[in-house]
């Protein structure tokens, strides 16, 4: 893949896999960058939600407003710096799922410099102290697809502590046994 292929891609998806439980095909932590010729359905739905919210709120950013509310309430806030926040997201699908998002909304991760890097390092350290060194995990950067006017990037961190079973696989319903508020409290102390 050359840089022009990457620039033309409908969606770019950066992932990091750690551990066999996280589906890693290699025995060491590794990152991969995918340049997809289409926008995945989950990203397209998110793009639509961002657009609908901006229309209803005269241009406000959905994730930007959620971040402001999480900072105000502090229940699920783990850490904050000048550029980004580290949260245990409301409605997390899995135990110890985390999100890093910019304090000021930006559509594309790649347009913002090292935003979130310090908090990502902090998040991984907190998870290691709480769950043990190098817990199996996936992380990915959700960034705006081509042509998305309203969007906001984020980094999702998903420790792989539970296995998907019949409920999750058969219905798409997630059963999270650790409340995000509990995760935030534990990781603030880690």
For the regions a protein language model found, what residue spans apply to each?
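HIT superfamily nucleotide-processing domains
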Residues: 1-190
């Amino acid at each position: 893949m050359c840089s022009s292929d990457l620039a033309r891609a409908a969606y770019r998806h950066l992932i990091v896999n750690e551990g066999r439980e996280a589906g890693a095909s290699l025995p060491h932590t590794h990152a991969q960058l995918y340049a997809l010729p289409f926008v995945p359905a989950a990203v397209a739905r998110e793009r639509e939600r961002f657009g609908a919210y901006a229309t209803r709120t005269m241009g406000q950013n959905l994730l930007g407003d959620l971040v402001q509310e999480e900072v105000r309430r502090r229940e699920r806030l783990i850490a904050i710096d000048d550029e980004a926040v580290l949260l245990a997201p409301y409605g997390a699908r899995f135990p110890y799922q985390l999100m890093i998002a910019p304090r000021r909304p930006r559509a594309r991760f790649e347009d913002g410099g090292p935003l979130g890097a310090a908090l990502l390092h902090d998040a991984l350290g907190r998870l290691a102290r709480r769950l043990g060194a190098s817990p199996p995990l996936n992380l990915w950067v959700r960034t705006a697809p081509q042509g998305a006017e309203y969007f906001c990037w984020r980094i999702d961190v998903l420790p792989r502590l539970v296995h998907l079973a019949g409920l999750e696989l058969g219905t798409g319903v997630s059963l999270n046994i650790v409340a995000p508020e509990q995760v935030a409290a534990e990781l603030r102390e880690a």
